[in-house]
């Protein structure tokens, strides 16, 4: 990639229909894990006007009121009024879960008497990434796109901007100079709102001003906002119909929002609703953990990790390190250190990151990476010093 360029990432709020589905799926997973952390869960959700459908495969000894979990999640997000197209109190919730296939279970549960050699729950490839663009070691565009919609929800919920409604989308276009963030070229923020904030199809100035002054300016670093920065606030105008009424929401349709905003490749597997025996989720978390520790250790300014698995096999097919020329030692040497210091077998990952806990609903909006909450164990940099020592730095 050229040293001077524009790069864009987007995020969506917790009230976006696809994120509603993700949060319900992960709320189901958490409710099950509170009772039975050994459960196998693949919980999918569809949400539309007045309707939630729960389907997938679950094998558990837990007894969970799935319908109530779905309603509670809608309530927490803010879908508490029929005017919003779905109301937690009166919407229909259909449940259609099966058990995990025995053919899959035999490869996952009985691959070896040694539990650390339990096989991966599926084949696939996963990526992790870190860079030094932000203190959280995340790419700047996706990080600040998340913070915009997160603040939109905060101001909506605490009543400071009561005319906001749950659905929202953000987008940041960053101008890079010499390969580093230099300024924000464009900010896009579209927020669902109550009807009185528009004149026909045009937004009222009070809405534009509130979004600018109370959401965009407090979030975006002042030094990156210039006289040339463009602001597009509800650029199509009126946005009253939104959420599951505006679009059908499905689990797993925001995988780039969930990860790095397009700054690195994606293996294609979604996260939400999946227990950590599914390497789509757990190995992607582990790859982030590895990449973040490499950057935190000063071994590279940016780092991409690829891992791949075969179903029923514990050892990864490959662990590949790519630092895009920013490494202080060769990439293959960093890969050797990764093999020495990180156990990337599925059970090793689960132990290393303590993943058999009800921690997942919080991950399902505003990004799985680049957050400092204690539950996000894959964001720790506790291996950085060991990496530096092993590298001789």
Swiss-Prot record:
Any single GO BP term: one-carbon metabolic process
Organism, scientific name: Albidiferax ferrireducens (strain ATCC BAA-621 / DSM 15236 / T118) (Rhodoferax ferrireducens)
InterPro entries noted in UniProt: ADOMET_SYNTHASE_CS, S-AdoMet_synt_C, S-AdoMet_synt_central, S-AdoMet_synt_N, S-AdoMet_synthetase, S-AdoMet_synthetase_sfam
Molecular-function GO terms, alphabetical: ATP binding; magnesium ion binding; methionine adenosyltransferase activity
Catalysed transformations (reactions): L-methionine + ATP + H2O = S-adenosyl-L-methionine + phosphate + diphosphate
HAMAP family reported for this sequence: S_AdoMet_synth1
Subunit architecture: Homotetramer; dimer of dimers.
Root EC class: transferase
Chain sites annotated for binding Mg(2+): 18
Annotated residues for binding of L-methionine: 57, 100, 247, 278
Subcellular location as annotated: Cytoplasm
Family, similarity comment: Belongs to the AdoMet synthase family.
Keywords: ATP-binding, Cytoplasm, Magnesium, Metal-binding, Nucleotide-binding, One-carbon metabolism, Potassium, Transferase
PANTHER family: S-ADENOSYLMETHIONINE SYNTHETASE
Function noted in UniProt: Catalyzes the formation of S-adenosylmethionine (AdoMet) from methionine and ATP. The overall synthetic reaction is composed of two sequential steps, AdoMet formation and the subsequent tripolyphosphate hydrolysis which occurs prior to release of AdoMet from the enzyme.
Cofactor binding comment, as recorded: Binds 2 divalent ions per subunit.
Keyword check for Cytoplasm: yes
Renumbered residue ranges of the record's region Flexible loop: 100-110
Name of this protein: S-adenosylmethionine synthase
Binding site residues for K(+): 44
Cofactor(s) demanded: Mg(2+); K(+)
UniProt EC number: 2.5.1.6
Keyword Metal-binding included in the entry's annotation: yes
Taxonomic superkingdom: Bacteria
């Amino acid at each position: 990639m050229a040293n001077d360029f524009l790069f864009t990432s987007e995020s969506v709020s917790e009230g976006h229909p696809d994120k509603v589905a993700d949060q319900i799926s992960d709320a189901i997973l958490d409710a099950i894990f509170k009772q039975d952390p050994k459960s196998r869960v693949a919980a999918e959700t569809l949400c539309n006007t007045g309707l939630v459908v729960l389907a997938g495969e679950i094998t558990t000894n837990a007894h969970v009121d799935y319908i109530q979990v779905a309603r509670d999640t809608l309530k927490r997000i803010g879908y508490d009024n029929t005017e919003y197209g779905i109301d937690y109190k009166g919407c229909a919730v259909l449940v259609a879960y099966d058990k995990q296939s025995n053919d899959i279970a035999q490869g996952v549960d009985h691959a070896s008497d040694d539990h650390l050699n339990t096989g991966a729950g599926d084949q696939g490839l996963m990526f992790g990434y870190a860079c030094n663009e932000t203190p959280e070691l995340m790419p700047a565009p996706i990080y600040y796109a998340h913070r915009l919609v997160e603040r939109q929800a905060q101001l909506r919920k605490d009543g400071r901007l009561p005319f906001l409604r749950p659905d929202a989308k953000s987008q940041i276009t960053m101008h890079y100079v010499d390969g580093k963030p230099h300024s924000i070229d464009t900010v896009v923020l579209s927020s669902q709102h109550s009807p009185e904030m528009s004149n026909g199809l045009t937004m009222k100035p009070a809405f534009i001003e509130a979004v600018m002054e109370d959401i965009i300016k407090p979030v975006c670093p002042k030094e990156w906002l210039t006289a040339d920065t463009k602001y597009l606030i509800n650029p199509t105008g009126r946005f009253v119909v939104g959420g599951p009424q505006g679009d059908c929401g499905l689990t797993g349709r925001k995988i780039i929002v969930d990860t790095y905003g397009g700054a690195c490749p994606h293996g294609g597997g979604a996260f939400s609703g999946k227990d950590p025996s599914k390497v789509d989720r757990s190995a992607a978390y582990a790859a982030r953990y590895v990449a973040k520790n490499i950057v935190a250790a000063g071994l590279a300014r940016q780092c991409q990790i690829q891992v791949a698995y075969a179903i029923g096999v514990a050892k990864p097919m490959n662990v590949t390190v790519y630092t895009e020329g920013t490494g202080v030692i060769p990439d293959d040497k960093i890969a050797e250190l990764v093999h020495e210091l990180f156990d990337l077998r599925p059970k090793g990952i689960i132990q290393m990151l303590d993943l058999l806990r009800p921690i997942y609903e919080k991950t399902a909006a505003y990004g799985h990476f680049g957050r400092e909450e204690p539950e996000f164990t894959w964001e720790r940099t506790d291996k950085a010093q060991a990496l530096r020592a092993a590298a001789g730095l």
